[in-house]
Amino acid sequence: MAAEQDPEGRAAARPLLTDLYQATMALGYWRAGRAQDQAEFELFFRQCPFGGAFALAAGLRDCVRFLRAFRLRDADVQFLASALPPDTDPAFFEHLRALDCSGVTVRALPEGSLAFPGVPLLQVSGPLLVVQLLETPLLCLVSYASLIATNAARLRLIAGPDKRLLEMGLRRAQGPDGGLTASTYSYLGGFDASSNVLAGQLRGVPVAGTLAHSFVTSFSGSEVPPDPMLAPAAGQGSQVDLAASVEMWLERVCGHLGLGVQEPHRGERAAFVAYALAFPRAFQGLLDTYSVRRSGLPNFLAVALALQELGYQAVGVRLDSGDLLQQAREIRGVFRTAAAQFGVPWLQSVPIAVSNNIDEEELARLAQKGSEVNVIGIGTSVVTCPRQPSLGCVYKLVSVGGQPRMKLTEDPEKQTLPGSKAAFRLLGSDGSLLLDVLQLAEEPPPQAGQELRVWPRGARESRTVRPAHVEPLLRLWVQQGQLCEPLPSLAESRAFAQQSLHRLSPAHRRLEQPALYQVALSEKLQALVDRLSARGAL
């Protein structure tokens, strides 16, 4: 198995959740006497996902948990011994048994940070053999989490701040751990809640859900509730037979809607009554099992008005098929006339929830001005990221023994930036984001108000910039295996992500054909790149 339960109960990465060549390289390092050489790797992506201009950094908490628990068990070492050549020196396996991350240091963007191509999400330094073994698990933990968070952020930007977004993609996710990761990081990216109960238990994600069509169709209308009596919400007064009250209200509702009392489906009405008896303070009707206009809507109104007499207020309706936008408008119109007809003002503002394979295009339609939709449930489109299934993060060596290392290639996009680095975000006087700058770690940081010459990546010429504010991007989270500061909670990271997105200019937030955000190199870093490139590098 590739996963075990961590203290939170979540499926956690284990050391052998890796590619075999990490183990073969580890043997090579050990055999060459280089296992303890101090090395630094950077984890980053080369292009923003989904054709956009930004990404959100995520997965740090999972990485820290993995590093702190990193240890090869006897069974792990025995398996590696079976996978490596039979004449491998047994001393190598004893070395593996003693490995941990006590010598590892991690700097990273806080979760929820805006991230741009080439800027490290993580910097990982420590003994060469160990930090090499960390490559695949860290990529696995960061790439999907960041992709999901970014996808969720895009959907939130489309929906706007007022629509309630529910993630309901567990049944469509790529396996149990993929489902849990998607629920966790869609919440970080801006969704309000998830249908995933385990995400609520383990990660503190707010959970939401009501009923499915199977609940409605399981009732025929001949069922007699074992106890149809319901007490008033205030707790005082006589109990009322809710089923009988609903039948009385149905006549009035059908008269208002111009329907015969036989038209609404009896089984659907029985299902609504059963659900209302179980959840009188949280009754929601699923309207489209049979006919929204002739059945679901009148049955819902009859139950909602019967509950109203007892002091309860229905919390909403849901649609799962058809033209969601048009149906929502029609339903809102009925709610308004019914509110006036029956003297129940709150009825006109009952929340309308929709779901049904909603993607970015349909979401934009549902979020347009004049839409009567209040709550939107999204499954497949958030958890599977159909527009781009992978962020394409990489983990590249940048220094060994304090000496810079650089990968040269005929593809300029795949060249790496050498040396241990610092990253800064430069801002204008109004707080607007100007650019991110990468520089060598030994360089003094940029100063607010001082002119700085930088080399934008991909440009042939340098430019000067005078920032009004300078923000360091990479924070020290783990030093020599020890946590340096408490990690923010998921809710705190979610709030930080929304703050980060609001700082982006509209041109950079634009989801189609956005203006690209600039990442630049300091003069000293650019000179190092040029020097290593000219001499063939390593």
Swiss-Prot record:
Cofactor binding: number and manner: Activity is highest with Mn(2+).
Cofactor: Mg(2+); Mn(2+)
Family of the protein in this entry: Belongs to the NAPRTase family.
GO biological process: NAD biosynthetic process via the salvage pathway
Record's catalysed reaction(s): nicotinate + 5-phospho-alpha-D-ribose 1-diphosphate + ATP + H2O = nicotinate beta-D-ribonucleotide + ADP + phosphate + diphosphate
Pathway involvement of the protein, from the record: Cofactor biosynthesis; NAD(+) biosynthesis; nicotinate D-ribonucleotide from nicotinate: step 1/1
Residues binding 5-phospho-alpha-D-ribose 1-diphosphate, per UniProt: T380
Swiss-Prot/TrEMBL keywords: Cytoplasm, Ligase, Magnesium, Manganese, Metal-binding, Phosphoprotein, Pyridine nucleotide biosynthesis, Transferase
PTM comment: Transiently phosphorylated on a His residue during the reaction cycle. Phosphorylation strongly increases the affinity for substrates and increases the rate of nicotinate D-ribonucleotide production. Dephosphorylation regenerates the low-affinity form of the enzyme, leading to product release.
The enzyme's E.C. designation: 6.3.4.21
Localisation: Cytoplasm, Cytosol
Entry-annotated residues carrying Phosphohistidine: H213
InterPro entries: Aldolase_TIM, NAPRTase_C, NAPRTase_N, Nic_PRibTrfase-Fam, Nic_PRibTrfase_pncB, Nicotinate_pribotase-like_C
General function of this protein: Catalyzes the first step in the biosynthesis of NAD from nicotinic acid, the ATP-dependent synthesis of beta-nicotinate D-ribonucleotide from nicotinate and 5-phospho-D-ribose 1-phosphate. Helps prevent cellular oxidative stress via its role in NAD biosynthesis.
Subunit structure: Homodimer.
Gene Ontology MF term list: metal ion binding; nicotinate phosphoribosyltransferase activity; transferase activity
GO cellular component: cytosol
Protein name as catalogued: Nicotinate phosphoribosyltransferase
